[in-house]
């Protein structure tokens, strides 16, 4: 990537998972792919809306990571802020110093 690469991280209530997946899949002009995993939210600002979450003491959440260039991250974040206003979705953007994909040829392919 020639422009500054960044990682846009999103954290939302797990019940929003499919909605987020659908939304990101529709952003083909900005998002080539993303990674997602389930996570647990802790802290004084985390809401525990369900009885199971209250018993466990943490919120069931989904965490998504998207690697893209900074201008595209800013545009995507603007769209997310509009589409998910009021949902308490948490986000942050961090620089990526290196990004790549290891191919399936293995180290012996270099010889």
Regions found by a protein language model. Name each.
Residues 1-111:
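Positively charged, small/polar-rich N-terminal and surface patches that mediate targeting and assembly
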């Amino acid at each position: 990537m020639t422009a500054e690469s960044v990682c846009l991280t999103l954290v939302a209530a797990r019940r929003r998972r499919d909605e987020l997946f659908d939304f990101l899949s529709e952003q083909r002009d900005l998002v080539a792919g993303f990674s997602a995993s389930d996570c647990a939210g802790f802290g004084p600002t985390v809401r525990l809306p369900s009885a199971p979450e209250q018993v466990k003491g943490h919120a069931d959440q989904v965490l998504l990571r998207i690697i893209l260039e900074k201008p595209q991250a800013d545009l995507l974040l603007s769209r997310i802020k509009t589409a998910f206003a009021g949902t308490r979705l948490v986000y942050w953007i961090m620089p990526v110093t290196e990004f790549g994909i290891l191919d399936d040829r293995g180290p012996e392919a270099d010889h």
